Regions:
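Phosphate-binding site recognition
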Residues: 1-348, 450
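A cross-kingdom feature that marks ATP-driven nucleic-acid transaction machinery
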Residues: 308, 314-477
Length: 477
């Protein structure tokens, strides 16, 4: 099958494969983002050894090390190891891998791929010292070895490989963080799969599933977008109905605390400070809380940001599109309503949600917005701002503020609308008030440029003149 997007990653991996020295590559990113698919489709029949760690989800932890060693032994046998018994330790297991690779060594590049490496590091298994010894003591001494490891547990990958302070310090020759598809890559994917969909619908698909290839791969091209959403999320035996629990259960130990934080952040689009999160979730302050926030950030479920005008008040907001959708529509439903999306497609509830979700899509495509504004080469800082009164009541909301190094500031109004967006007299007054509030907060040398980001553009009338730039959903592709 064709690999959609990933051009930079493909070029880097091919360059590393063709080098004449040992290479140690770590690929990490959110679960379901396509790490394994990329390696499998790129290298196809060039693997010397391939092993996938055993998922700990729904397994008894006391047997995990035994089971991990057993499956590793089976992989060794699949690739030709004979005359050996199942190893009882990871030192012994990697010694058997060395033996297998020596048998296969013909002087050509030998590609070793270990998928879901973090799952193999079970409690008290001493996996890391054995893995360090395999690389430092043997693999790194062979110029024809290329070792690729993958993992969805991003913090494990960063702590134990990328930022390792022990035996693997500075041993990686390359690290690749694989991100979800952009809208443009989703469009390429749908076209490749012969799925006919307008960009208007593609944006709504992105609101629901994000750019996660695995979810998009489940689409049935015979169905409309509402039918696909129902089939995957709301109908009986929907394939993704339990995905939220499975996702966190496979990524994190003690996943309940991680899910508490995510559920907390789903309640307010602007997010919360660390202190507010701990108070709402009852998670104790300390290293554990920091680890949770760091892990969720590294896995791209949440993002830290500084709200406009609050340079020392870091907030965290939920940014994973699938989680946002799931927690809004499915989390509290004892039994999801069959055909919910089709039955409510034009309802006020769904239209209101689309407005919020479109803002998140725009925040996921800042580089595309900057390119459309012609400011890709200018340093910028992006934020949002909810203006509140003395009692904390919201007075005004600014969806996206782009502060530029050239002393211009784009105040972006984001609207998801079924036709051309029209500014009437009342909304014109609202926009002027927002601009004045922002101007009062900025330096006198800064210029505010009102910018709209809408689905199909701005209707020209007597009130549209103050808009300096008008972008549409096409600019996000």
């Amino acid at each position: 099958m064709q690999i959609i997007g990933r051009k930079n990653e493909i070029e880097e991996l091919e360059t590393l494969y063709n080098s004449r020295k040992p290479e140690f590559v770590a690929i990490y990113g959110r679960r379901r983002v396509g790490k394994t698919y990329l390696v499998k489709e790129l290298f196809k029949d060039r693997f010397t050894f391939w092993h996938t760690g055993l998922s700990p989800y729904d397994r008894e932890r006391r047997y995990l090390m035994r089971d991990q060693l057993q499956t590793f032994y089976y992989s060794l046998q699949d690739y030709g190891l004979t005359g050996e018994t199942c190893p009882k330790s990871w030192l012994e297991a990697f010694r058997l891998l060395e033996k297998l690779l020596k048998q296969k060594d013909e002087g050509k590049r030998m590609l070793v791929f270990i998928d879901e490496l973090p799952w193999m590091d079970t409690a008290r298994s001493r996996f890391i010292p054995a893995f360090e010894h395999f690389w430092n003591g043997w693999a790194a001494k062979h110029d024809n070895i290329m070792l690729i490891v993958c993992g969805s547990a991003t913090t494990w990958m960063t702590d134990n490989l990328i930022n390792n302070k022990g035996g693997l310090y500075n041993r990686l020759t390359s690290e690749i963080q694989l991100n979800p598809f952009t809208l443009s890559e989703c469009e390429d994917y749908f076209r490749y799969q012969d799925i006919v969909m307008s960009r208007y619908e593609m944006v709504q698909a992105y609101m629901t599933f994000g750019g996660i290839p695995h979810y998009l791969n489940l689409f049935d091209k015979r169905l409309s977008l509402p039918q696909n959403i129902d089939a995957l999320l709301f109908n009986r035996n929907a394939k993704l109905q339990n995905e939220f629990d499975r996702l966190f259960g496979s990524l994190f130990k003690n996943e309940e605390d991680y899910m508490k934080v995510v559920r907390c952040l789903a309640k307010r689009r602007s997010g919360y400070t660390r202190e507010e999160i701990l108070e709402a979730t009852k998670i104790k302050d300390g290293g554990g809380a920091s680890d949770i926030l760091r892990a969720l950030t590294a896995s791209k479920f949440i993002t830290p940001y500084l709200p406009f005008g609050q340079p020392k008040r870091i907030h965290y907001r939920l940014c994973d599109h699938f989680c946002l959708f799931y927690l809004h529509f499915l989390d509290k439903a004892e039994k999801p309503e069959e055909h919910f999306w089709q039955n409510n497609y034009m309802s006020g509830k769904l239209n209101a949600w689309r407005g919020y979700a479109f803002e998140e899509v725009c925040l996921s495509h800042i580089p595309q917005i900057k390119a459309a504004l012609g400011i890709s080469g200018i340093n910028t800082k992006e934020s949002s701002w909810i203006v509140r009164d003395a009692n904390g009541k919201p007075l005004s909301q600014m969806d996206l503020i782009i502060e530029r190094a050239d002393n211009n500031v784009n105040l972006c109004e984001i609207k998801f609308y079924g036709s051309l967006f029209e500014i009437d007299k009342r909304y014109d007054a609202t926009l002027r008030d927002r601009m004045q509030i922002l101007i009062n907060k900025l330096s006198p040398k800064q210029t505010v440029k009102l910018t709209t980001i809408t689905t199909f553009g701005l209707k020209r009338n007597e009130y549209s003149g103050q808009v300096q730039s008008s972008l549409t959903l096409d600019n996000l592709f």
